[in-house]
Amino acid sequence: MTKQHAFTREDLLRCSRGELFGPGNAQLPAPNMLMVDRITHISEEGGKFGKGELVAELDINPDLWFFACHFEGDPVMPGCLGLDAMWQLVGFYLGWQGNPGRGRALGSGEVKFFGQVLPTAKKVTYNIQIKRTMRGKLVLAIAEGTVSVDGREIYSAEGLRVGLFTSTENF
């Protein structure tokens, strides 16, 4: 069976309900925490490290939930949501590869914020470069990622780590 290399909003919502990779396997969060509208490219080859890459997008509009509360009179998308989106995508990549288990963010190395997402923006683009995947007691991916708004890079993260666990009871 040929793997799908792009995913629509409806595909991602199916993933949030556990319908894309099967019960007990990688899921994206449901809205409002789902920070991606589409994955435009996903591949196990290529990318900066030759281990795979993802490109995904989030459409921005002034009615998004976080603009009303972060901050009143000075609306800006919380930087942690962009970081979480990158973790979401690394976990999605592991599920897309066919690995079993539920995803958990395990940390990151250096994270830099040098721009912001305002309600006047149109589109956020996430670019994830897979550095390494490991399959042992747990399935683990390490990646680098960037967040861009309307074509301008505004965040970067090194050492994004996500693991898949067949049991999360003792995590």
UniProtKB/Swiss-Prot annotation:
Gene Ontology molecular functions: (3R)-hydroxyacyl-[acyl-carrier-protein] dehydratase activity; trans-2-decenoyl-acyl-carrier-protein isomerase activity
Coiled coil feature spans: none
Biological processes annotated in GO: unsaturated fatty acid biosynthetic process
GO cellular component: cytoplasm
This enzyme's EC code(s): 4.2.1.59, 5.3.3.14
InterPro entries membership: FabA (IPR010083), FabA_FabZ (IPR013114), HotDog_dom_sf (IPR029069)
Active site: 70
Main location: cytoplasm
Pathway listed: Lipid metabolism; fatty acid biosynthesis
SUPFAM superfamilies: Thioesterase/thiol ester dehydrase-isomerase (SSF54637)
Highest rank taxon of the organism: Bacteria
Compartments, record wording: Cytoplasm
Any one Pfam family match given in the protein's UniProt record, by short name: FabA
Record's catalysed reaction(s): a (3R)-hydroxyacyl-[ACP] = a (2E)-enoyl-[ACP] + H2O; (3R)-hydroxydecanoyl-[ACP] = (2E)-decenoyl-[ACP] + H2O; (2E)-decenoyl-[ACP] = (3Z)-decenoyl-[ACP]
Subunit structure as annotated in this protein's UniProt entry: Homodimer.
Role summary: Necessary for the introduction of cis unsaturation into fatty acids. Catalyzes the dehydration of (3R)-3-hydroxydecanoyl-ACP to E-(2)-decenoyl-ACP and then its isomerization to Z-(3)-decenoyl-ACP. Can catalyze the dehydratase reaction for beta-hydroxyacyl-ACPs with saturated chain lengths up to 16:0, being most active on intermediate chain length.
Protein name: 3-hydroxydecanoyl-[acyl-carrier-protein] dehydratase
Organism this protein belongs to: Pseudomonas syringae pv. tomato (strain ATCC BAA-871 / DC3000)
